[in-house]
Amino acid sequence: MKSLVGTKTRENLLKAFAGESQARNRYTIYAKTADKEGYKQIAKLFLETAENEYQHAKRFFNFLAEGLKEELPTVVEINAGYPVALGDTVENLKAAAAGEKEEWDELYPEFAEVAKEEGFPEVAAAFLKIAEVEQRHETRFIKLKENIEN
């Protein structure tokens, strides 16, 4: 992989890494809420999704480490917003679905296009593949929310 130094892809990978890392922790917190409310299956699915997010974060982090290897250790600053939402299980499922939708529908396709334009086809492919997974996560969270409400 060529160097990520000075690229927008570097910034996008770091944003994605931070976002996936935070989603993992949010879902772990949401699992505890679901468990306390008696939604054992939903708690399990939140934890399963948290593990998926860990794998996504790891993939993005590995791209960063490989593309910045000449500069390691290094500090890369980013400016980005991340969701903060905590409520009951229905509210948490709604927030989780919204976060997943933003990733697959907006962020990752945009990040993939930038990576492709900057000559990082493997990074672009990873963004698109992970976007597919995030879409399935959104669908699952919506269905679980609807099951509780109905």
Task: Write out the residue ranges for each language-model feature.
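Non-heme di-metal
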Residues: 1-150
